[in-house]
Amino acid sequence: MIKLSLQSLCYRDTFNAGKITMLEIIDKAAEYRMDGVDLHFTHFASTDDDYLEEVKQACLKRGLHMCYIGVSNNFGKTGAELREQIDLMKKWIDVAARMGIPMVRTFGSWVPDGESDESAWPRLVESTKQVAEYGESKGVVVGLHNHNHGCIPATGDQVIRLLDDVDNPYYSHILDTGQYLGSPGVSLGERGKEDPEWNFYGSIETSAPRAVHVRAKIYRIASGEEAWLDYDRIMPIIKNVGFNGWMSIVFEGQDELDEPTAVPLANSFMRSM
């Protein structure tokens, strides 16, 4: 059975305004009778043992599984800056191992000006291999999050290529339903409208068999149903590959609706799917 988790970034604006803490976000997940939480690395107040234990116990006492730590890296950088990105991933793999969290989210590369996807690709593969090998040594899976906004991999084919090029059992795939090229939620083209040049539902189909976690993106939920993404089309794709794992609710419609109103609506909608 697919299980629902709350991505802590659903409360991005509330958190940034100092009106909620990660521990209080965990309380919200329990209040909405969700099954787990995804914890963004910027929401940790500390990496001291006492604080990490407090977070772990808060989830345990509320019956919530800690699905993954989301880290925002960029393997498109070079030199010392690239080494810093690799070290950032290793730091949070260590945190995950200390907390018993099975996975850490990774991005690919934001391709620098003057480079092509192909010229940046070998650097992406080599950096990711280092991180995946480190994850393997710690017993923590590194989950590739497909992303657009100038980032690769941005298509289903690119995701499969990178997974195969890295070729490590501790390197897997976190499928984001709204972040493939052509999605109404991406930055290229007119936001809110599907780009017909790209078959983003096809990208979801391509990478779904490799997914160990799905991020269900929510952009417009004021009506009680997601308006930009067609979940009547997406959910059969996910279910038909036998997916039986975790699905995060990830709200990114703060320009339309406030987070305290939107998150319970998104939870109810995804449960209806």
What is the predicted role of each segment?
Residues 114-128:
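Active-site cleft segment of glycoside hydrolase catalytic domains centered on the general acid/base Glu
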Residues 96-117, 138-148:
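Active-site groove signature of glycoside hydrolases
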Residues 6, 29, 37, 59, ...:
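Conserved, mostly hydrophobic/aromatic
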Residues 64, 101-102, 140, 241-245:
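A short helix->loop->beta-strand "cap" motif at the edges of active sites that frequently abuts
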Residues 246-254:
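Short acidic/histidine-rich active-site segments
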